Regions:
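Peripheral interaction segments used for macromolecular assembly
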Residues: 1-155
């Protein structure tokens, strides 16, 4: 089981060993499956970012991500980042999580997925704020197999 917060900041290496950038964010598709990684690559005016499709990631280790070639890096305008973990138009981080009875469980602090098998989200780490995290710790909400019982709202 891997978490998104661990991936952010990791170097992205090409197969030849050169560094292509660092992971800045993770992009999701319309079904909230991991679809791409957003690179923090030095661009002067920052109107565009580089992204790599998750299918082009050759290896996802504890210390780095490896992609096959520079050709898999694609430049996209920053305003086209729709669903991401922390920097897009719709951010998964800090979204509130409610039960079907309307009780708030907390806010999303991290996301868990199975790295080698697939890109489906398998759980969330929830926070109630800094003091609650310090005194009580964060809670994990591990999803049952499949995402039938989970619905993500607009806000």
């Amino acid at each position: 089981m891997q978490n998104v917060q661990h991936l952010i900041g990791l170097p992205v290496l090409l197969a030849n060993g050169r560094q292509a950038g660092r992971v800045q964010d993770i992009g999701f598709d319309e079904f909230w499956r991991l679809s791409c990684i957003i690179l923090d690559k030095r661009i002067w005016f920052r109107k565009a970012v580089y992204a790599v499709d998750w299918s082009d990631v050759a290896a996802c280790g504890d210390d780095a991500l490896v992609v096959s070639a520079r050709a898999v890096l694609r430049k996209i305008p920053r305003h086209r980042l729709l669903r991401t973990f922390q920097t897009g138009i719709v951010k998964l981080k800090e979204l509130p999580v409610y039960t079907v009875e309307g009780r708030e469980l907390g806010r999303v602090a991290d996301v868990y997925f199975r790295s080698p098998e697939g890109t489906q989200i398998i759980g969330y780490e929830l926070t109630d704020g800094f003091l609650a995290d310090v005194f009580e710790g964060r809670r994990r909400l591990i999803l049952p197999e499949g995402s039938e019982g989970v619905s993500l709202g607009e806000n």
